[in-house]
Structures are given as structure tokens and as C-alpha cells.
């Protein structure tokens, strides 16, 4: 009986903890920011989300600095990003060291970084990579990774160009893909459609120019005939 009572007591503890956490969640459910976090927490179940949130709650200030205004100078962005990642990454390592067994470390490291990524435009793997570069004093790699994530327009253009072969195949078009990419780039950058002096011109331009010249020749002949002065005929 004593053993059964002991088991019952141990079984009641986690239920009591879950009940307390659910009460906290219902009291804070009015916040739209937290609701949106729950909706976008891909790969995080509700219990894992709550665990990550409670452990990282004291570091709200550093979580906010992962998403800075776009008009903030680049130097300040780098400074705040490095400071926040060092504090958050060290906090995660402390959690893994003191609260996780060896087989749990990989899982909880992944979950905690994924939770942190909810406060940033970067993915969890990118944030963890930036943390490693900061801790190992590799500023060049940090800068390359950080700046690459700050240029979404380039990646969007690359995605469009990569999707061209798929579109051509789906529509049954078997034309020159490189030519289509060139025309696409000319359309996206107005004013650069005409070739620069000294650059070879495409066959389409050559054909159009030759047809234009042929159509203009008879007009010039007619114009010359009209403009020629009438000369009186002379008898022999």
C-alpha cells in the first residue's frame, strides 16, 4: 500500500504542474502576440513550447533585440545581435548541462533554438551558426552569414530564375532557357534592354534592323524623285 501511495504521489506532481501552466496560459491568452507565436511554432508541441518559454522568460530583453528596426544602422544591428546570441546561447548550454541527460541534449538544443527563432527573421540553424561564430571569434564568417540573411530580394530573383525550366516544361515550351533568363533580367531592370556599344547584338535585333532598312529604301527613292527639279526637254 505504501508503494502504491508513493506512486500516486509522484503521479500527481506532473498533473499539478500542467494545471498551473494551463492557468497561466488562459490568463495570458488575451495577448495576440503570444497567440501568434503559438500559431507559428512549427515543430514545437504545446508542452515543449511552454518549457522553452518558461526557461527563457528571464531573457525577454535579449529575445526582443533579435528583431530590430530595418532603419537601424548596420553597426548597431551587429552589436545587439552578437550580445543577444551570446546570452541566449550560453543560457541554452546551461540548461542542457544541468537539466538534460546525454540522450536528451540534441533534442532540447534543437527545440530551444527553434523557439528563439520565433523572435527573429532568421532560422534556428542560422542563429545557432551565428552564435558559434561569435563564441569562436570568427567575425568574417559572422558578417557573411548575417548579411546574406539581410538580402531577401536576391534570393527571390534566384528562385524566379530557377523556376523557369520547370515552367517551360509544364507549358510544353522547349526554347532557349538562357535567352529567357536574359529577357527576364532585362524586364526587371528597365533601361538595360539595349546592348552597350561594343557588345554583340542578338540575331533578333539584326533581323529587325535589316527589315527596317529594306522598308526605308523605297521611301528614300520616291522622295528623291519628287524633290528632283524638272528639266526642259531639248530638241536635237
From Swiss-Prot:
Show the ranges annotated as biased composition (Basic and acidic residues).
202-216
Tell me which GO cellular component terms the UniProt record holds: cytoplasm; nucleus
Keyword entries, A-Z: Cytoplasm, Nucleus
The protein's predominant localisation is cytoplasm
Q: Which domain of life is it from?
A: Eukaryota
What Pfam families does UniProt report for this protein, alphabetically?
CHD1-like_C
List the residue ranges of the region (CHD1 helical C-terminal domain (CHCT)): 44-145
Q: Where is this region: Disordered?
A: 184-236
Where located? Cytoplasm; Nucleus
Notes concerning its domains? The CHD1 helical C-terminal domain (CHCT) may bind DNA and nucleosomes.
The free-text function statement in the UniProt record for this protein reads:
May play a role in regulation of apoptosis.
Protein name stated in the entry: CHD1 helical C-terminal domain containing protein 1
* Species for this entry: Homo sapiens (Human)
Amino acid at each position: 500500500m505504501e508503494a502504491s501511495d508513493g506512486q500516486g504521489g509522484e503521479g500527481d506532481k506532473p498533473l499539478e504542474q500542467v494545471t498551473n501552466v494551463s492557468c497561466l496560459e488562459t490568463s495570458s491568452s488575451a495577448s495576440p502576440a503570444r497567440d501568434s507565436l503559438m500559431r507559428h511554432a512549427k515543430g514545437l508541441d504545446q508542452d515543449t513550447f511552454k518549457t522553452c518559454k518558461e526557461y527563457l522568460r528571464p531573457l525577454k530583453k535579449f529575445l526582443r533585440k533579435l528583431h530590430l528596426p530595418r532603419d537601424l544602422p548596420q553597426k548597431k544591428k551587429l552589436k545587439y545581435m552578437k550580445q543577444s546570441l551570446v546570452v541566449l546561447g550560453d543560457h541554452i548550454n546551461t540548461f542542457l548541462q544541468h537539466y538534460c541527460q546525454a540522450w536528451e541534449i540534441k533534442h532540447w538544443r534543437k527545440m530551444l533554438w527553434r523557439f528563439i527563432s520565433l523572435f527573429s527573421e532568421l532560422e534556428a540553424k542560422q542563429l545557432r551558426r551565428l552564435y558559434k561564430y561569435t563564441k569562436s571569434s570568427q567575425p568574417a564568417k559572422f558578417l557573411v552569414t548575417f548579411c546574406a540573411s539581410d538580402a531577401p530580394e536576391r534570393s527571390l530573383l534566384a528562385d524566379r530564375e530557377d523556376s523557369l525550366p520547370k515552367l517551360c516544361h509544364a507549358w510544353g515550351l522547349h526554347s532557349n532557357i538562357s535567352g529567357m533568363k536574359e529577357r527576364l533580367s532585362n524586364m526587371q531592370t528597365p533601361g538595360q534592354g539595349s546592348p552597350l556599344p561594343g557588345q554583340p547584338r542578338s540575331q533578333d535585333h539584326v533581323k529587325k534592323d535589316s527589315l527596317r532598312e529594306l522598308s526605308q529604301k523605297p521611301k528614300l527613292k520616291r522622295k528623291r524623285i519628287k524633290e528632283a527639279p524638272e528639266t526642259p526637254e531639248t530638241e536635237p
